[in-house]
């Protein structure tokens, strides 16, 4: 990201952490334990597993990235069902605490999107790495293909932390031979017109781009 983009995200994060700005309109969070509909839908499951960026904080439930991904799958003729297992505010540690609720669904693919809140809070990068590795390991042991969503953070904790954080995602992906989305918010982060008033969470239009970022990596796994 260029300097202006980084500065914009940094200011947005500071504003959010201080409680400033107008709050985004609320949306219902996804359940901590994903549910399977009782209509005997036998399509293979793709679970979107993450924090508020996955849950779709601030947008209509039909406009978040999991919902848009379902629409793209349907339009492309792929018979999969997307289950949104995003919970706002979660760190990688909290994701690890509930990874078993995803495994019991026996998903074909899990898109793992954690780390943004770790980086925002300046949590130890090594702890994030270990949590993410454990999540991926457990999901693969359950038979799922795993896609890791790469994250980037502004440099407010210094270059060493920022660079180390960015390296977590490709390194874990390489270790476990998992697929990697290089940057989940590529083309969205730092663009005010594609983000809500907090400067962090995408708008419905922003999620259109997020879905394309996901699709580039996910679609080859479905062929």
Task: State where each predicted segment sits.
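Bacterial N-terminal signal peptides that target proteins for export
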Residues: 1-6
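Bacterial signal peptide processing site
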Residues: 19-22
């Amino acid at each position: 990201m260029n300097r202006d983009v980084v500065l914009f995200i940094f200011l947005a994060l500071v504003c959010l952490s201080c409680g400033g700005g107008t709050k985004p309109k609320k949306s219902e969070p996804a359940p901590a334990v994903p549910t399977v509909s009782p209509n005997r839908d036998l399509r293979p499951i793709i679970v979107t597993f993450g924090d508020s960026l996955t849950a779709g904080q601030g947008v209509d439930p039909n406009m978040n990235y999991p919902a848009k991904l379902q629409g793209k799958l349907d339009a492309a003729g792929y018979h999969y069902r997307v289950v949104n297992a995003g919970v706002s505010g979660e760190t990688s540690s909290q994701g690890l605490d509930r990874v078993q609720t995803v495994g019991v669904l026996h998903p074909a693919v899990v898109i793992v999107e954690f780390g943004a809140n770790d980086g925002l809070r300046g949590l130890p990068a090594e702890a994030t790495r270990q949590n993410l590795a454990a999540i991926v390991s457990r999901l693969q042991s359950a038979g799922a293909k795993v896609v890791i969503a790469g994250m980037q953070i502004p440099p407010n904790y210094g270059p060493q932390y920022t660079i180390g954080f960015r390296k977590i995602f490709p390194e874990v992906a390489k270790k476990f031979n998992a697929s990697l989305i290089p940057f989940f918010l590529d083309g969205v982060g730092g663009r005010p017109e594609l983000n809500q008033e907090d400067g962090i969470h995408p708008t419905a239009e922003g999620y259109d781009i997020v879905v394309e970022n996901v699709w580039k990596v996910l679609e080859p796994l479905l062929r």
